[in-house]
Amino acid sequence: MQDDERKETWDEFRGLVNMSPAELEKWLASEESQSAGQHKDGGESTGHASGRRILDILRTNKGDLSDDDYQHMRKVVGYIRRHVAQRPSGDVRDTRWRHSLMNWGHDPLD
């Protein structure tokens, strides 16, 4: 990945991932987090696994991020954009929609 692509990816990722590492870590430990999203074979949901990966990325020095990290960041940006566009009507405070986005590091209420 070229430097300009990395910069664009970083900027988009940091613009959409609006939860701090501490907030995301606390959220991922919650029952609401673990029950949100699509679970494969009764295991961890895709979003929850992504949240753990996002936490690792946020805690890594920017210069130490790999191309694989940047690819995951692109995936996160795409997911958040798609799901924000599908916001349900009404109060979303305790919805699976919000909980799923929070697993991906984005709290739509912030």
Can you say where each PLM-predicted feature lies in the sequence?
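A charge-rich, low-complexity, intrinsically flexible signal that marks solvent-exposed coils, linkers
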Residues: Q2-D110
